[in-house]
């Protein structure tokens, strides 16, 4: 019988549990301390440096250069950019200046007056108070650094300008610009500020490092899609983007107004294109109810750029940019299915149009969900005994590679077909990958089997085919995903052929699976072809040749000399860095001849370097993939075809990377799993983790340990590039133009240091 002393001894599992809790608590406290130190000390260094500032000022108003005049409302107007400055004196007790601006009420009133003046003069372009003000502070004759500020981003009002003497703050704006600046103050104290958005960003980075580091417990948990606990965890994780994107959807539904822009003598930019399509469908007509100028209707060849320019010069308006004009009517050449599924129901229920940005967010959220499911299913098929840590890294890398960040950032009608097709294709392939299931069917007739090949679920085959065929009404290039059915179901196709030759399978039985794929596809594609036929007299004519765009699209083709460059830029366009926020810039992409080009910050293999493992797939022949190699190689082949197609037909466009990025990310999965796990073990996860010990590091080989750090850092790199790319000033729909307050708020985190 054990003694009392022996009874009091804690068991070894209890001791280990307590040690884990202590380690977790220490790590948590260390993370909190690190974040607090960064926030209170590093990011608030300007506060600590200016505690001794004199705060003296030598005048109520600054001396203005002769290139500035003060308006009645207190703002400034630039009359001569070469002499547009404010002059004051600094005593050297503070390295910072503060530029004061007028109140939001005064600025908003001036903008309203400018807009009213523009409308009263046939949308004539007029000057409005600037939202982004470019300034440069020179101290005692020493040229300072140029930077920008925003009236609503208070922290951006502080400008670093060390030294003493005469200070000139140059307003670097064009003649006639209205600058909502009143005065500037030297010798100021920078206030202490805790920015909770910055704190959250640091916490998220530390959290990702904690859960993905090689010693994380997630490396010791086997991925098990059938586990209820893991399914609930997956739902919980997806609740985060659902909540964030859901808030954005509600905001867009509540606040977004009609996005129509027109300047006299120029094209009309109407971003409610899908709303107009919904109105046309509800009214039962194929064309859009938009006015057609008489001069345009009388023009024989309206697609010629010079002809359109002459029409604009003669006052013909409106000419809608990126709308298709054909046979006296305006049309949309973008896929109609999103309008049918989202915009028309909302129009009928709410009585007004669904904001395009809200529809984009809905589709991207669905894409995130379905593509994550697809990637997890591929991971489990390729390496069933991998870890949760490896799977989560691969999912995040794949989402970024598939242009999730770009689609979330740009929410106009151009991205709607891409987001819709990514959603439908992800769901369709997920259903197809799950079609060879051993689960008991609801009805025996739902299963189809040929020879010794795995049985197939006919409902999943049919629903998958329905989704993939629906791409014909979204982004037609995604219909090439149907080709992936052949390598995926090749064992069944081969068994079917053998069965028919040996007459072991009856013809009617043999047709069940093919018909389960063909019939849904026909049901979807037939009305879409009819829609094209009614509008443009051909089932395969989507109307893109009739768009009013950069060239005469009825004749334009990408120059053959540009093809090699386009392909190279899509895959390997280098990143371009600079020494100031956001440290990332648009990367130049010179062409031998003129062609369409959208500014890009990088390419699939440079912005998301883990996708390079897709190129290693043909070399990893000895890696066990459980029969998935032909399918994954086909993904790589289809991606190559689409890169060439987009280079030829579309030119160089960032959004076109969404055509093939998801395919390359799928093809990279085996290589990524091999990097972090090694060759697949025959029996347990311990082999994949190199017999990891209790802390997950001690018995992991140094090479594998290093690779896990490399993969984790590469994922963080890709996320960082995706986030910083949102702040690039030269990109389309730049944040500094569309949301200057947010841009300058984030910029001010770093410019004062």
What residue spans do the PLM features occupy?
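Hydrophobic, aromatic-rich transmembrane alpha-helices
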Residues: 581, 588-629
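Perimembrane helix-loop-helix junctions
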Residues: 480-522
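Specific aromatic-rich, kink-prone transmembrane helix
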Residues: 419-450, 468, 663-667
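Transmembrane-helix motifs of polytopic, lipid-linked glycan transferases
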Residues: 354-384, 427
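Membrane-interface alpha helices of multi-pass inner-membrane proteins
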Residues: 426, 449-475, 482-486
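Start-transfer (signal-anchor) and selected internal transmembrane alpha helices
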Residues: 1-43, 196-272, 391, 508-520, ...
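Interfacial juxtamembrane loops and adjacent helix segments
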Residues: 267, 271, 283-334, 399, ...
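Juxtamembrane segments of multi-pass membrane glycosylation machinery
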Residues: 313, 319-362, 381-382, 589-598
């Amino acid at each position: 019988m054990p003694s009392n002393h022996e009874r009091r001894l804690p068991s070894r599992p209890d001791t280990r549990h307590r040690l884990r809790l202590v380690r977790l608590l220490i790590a948590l406290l260390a993370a909190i301390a690190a974040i607090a130190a960064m926030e209170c000390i590093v990011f608030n260094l300007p506060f600590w440096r200016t505690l001794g500032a004199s705060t003296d000022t030598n005048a109520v108003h600054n001396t203005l250069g002769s290139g500035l005049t003060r308006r009645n409302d207190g703002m400034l107007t630039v009359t001569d950019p070469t002499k547009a400055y404010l002059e004051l004196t600094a005593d050297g007790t503070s390295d910072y200046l503060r530029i004061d601006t007028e109140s939001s009420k005064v600025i908003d009133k001036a903008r309203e007056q400018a807009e009213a003046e523009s409308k009263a003069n046939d949308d004539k372009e007029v000057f409005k108070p600037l939202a982004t003000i470019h300034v440069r502070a020179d101290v005692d004759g020493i040229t300072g650094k140029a930077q920008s500020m925003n009236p609503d981003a208070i922290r951006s009002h502080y400008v670093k300008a060390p030294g003493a003497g005469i200070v000139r703050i140059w307003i670097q704006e064009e003649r006639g610009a209205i600058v909502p600046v009143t005065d500037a103050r030297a010798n100021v104290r920078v206030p202490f500020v805790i920015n909770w958005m910055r704190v959250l960003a640091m916490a998220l980075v530390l959290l990702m490092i904690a859960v993905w580091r090689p010693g994380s417990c997630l490396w010791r948990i086997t991925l098990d899609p059938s586990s209820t606990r893991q399914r609930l965890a997956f739902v919980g994780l997806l609740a985060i983007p659902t909540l964030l994107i859901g808030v954005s959807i509600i905001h867009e539904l509540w606040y977004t107004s009609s996005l129509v822009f027109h300047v006299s003598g120029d094209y009309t930019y109407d971003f409610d294109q899908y709303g107009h399509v919904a109105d046309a469908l509800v009214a039962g007509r194929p064309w859009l109810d938009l006015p057609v100028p008489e001069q345009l209707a009388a023009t024989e060849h309206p697609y010629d750029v010079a002809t359109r320019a002459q029409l604009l010069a003669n006052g013909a308006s409106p000419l809608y940019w990126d709308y298709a004009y054909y046979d006296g009517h305006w049309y949309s050449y973008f896929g109609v299915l999103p309008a049918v599924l989202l915009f028309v129901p909302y129009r009928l229920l709410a009585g007004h149009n669904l904001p395009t940005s809200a529809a984009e967010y809905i589709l991207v959220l669905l894409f995130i969900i379905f593509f994550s499911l697809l990637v997890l299913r591929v991971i489990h098929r390729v390496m069933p005994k991998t870890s949760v840590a490896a799977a989560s890294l691969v999912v995040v890398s794949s989402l970024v590679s598939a242009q999730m960040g770009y689609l979330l950032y740009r929410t106009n009608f151009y991205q709607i077909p891409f987001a819709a097709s990514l959603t439908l294709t992800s769901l369709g392939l997920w259903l197809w990958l799950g079609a060879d299931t051993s689960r008991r069917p609801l009805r025996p007739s739902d299963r189809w089997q040929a020879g010794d090949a795995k049985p197939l679920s006919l409902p999943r085959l049919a629903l998958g085919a329905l989704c993939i065929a629906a791409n014909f009404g979204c982004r037609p290039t995604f219909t090439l995903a149907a080709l992936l059915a052949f390598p995926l179901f090749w064992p069944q196709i081969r068994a079917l052929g053998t069965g028919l030759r040996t007459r072991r399978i009856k013809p009617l039985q043999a047709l069940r699976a093919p018909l389960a794929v063909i019939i849904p596809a026909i049901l979807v594609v037939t009305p879409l072809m009819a829609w094209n036929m009614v509008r443009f007299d051909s089932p395969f004519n989507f109307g893109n040749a009739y768009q009013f765009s950069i060239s005469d699209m009825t004749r334009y083709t990408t120059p053959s000399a540009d093809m090699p460059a386009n392909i190279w830029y899509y895959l390997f366009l280098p990143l371009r860095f600079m020494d100031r926020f956001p440290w990332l810039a648009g990367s130049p992409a010179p062409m031998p001849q003129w062609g369409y080009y959208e500014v890009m910050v990088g390419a699939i293999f440079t912005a998301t370097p883990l996708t390079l493992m897709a190129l290693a797939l043909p070399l990893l022949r000895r890696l066990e993939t459980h029969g998935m190699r032909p399918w994954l190689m086909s993904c790589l082949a289809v991606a190559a075809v689409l890169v060439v197609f987009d280079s030829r037909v579309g030119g160089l466009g960032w959004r076109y990377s969404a055509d093939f990025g998801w395919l390359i990310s799928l093809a990279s999965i085996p290589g990524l799993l091999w990097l972090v796990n090694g060759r697949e073990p025959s029996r347990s996860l311990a082999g994949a983790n190199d017999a990891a010990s209790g802390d997950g590091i001690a018995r992991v080989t140094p090479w594998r340990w290093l690779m896990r750090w490399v993969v984790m850092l590469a994922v963080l790199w890709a996320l960082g590039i995706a986030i910083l790319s949102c702040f690039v000033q030269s990109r389309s729909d730049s944040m500094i133009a569309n949301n200057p307050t947010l841009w300058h708020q984030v910029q001010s985190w770093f410019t004062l240091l």
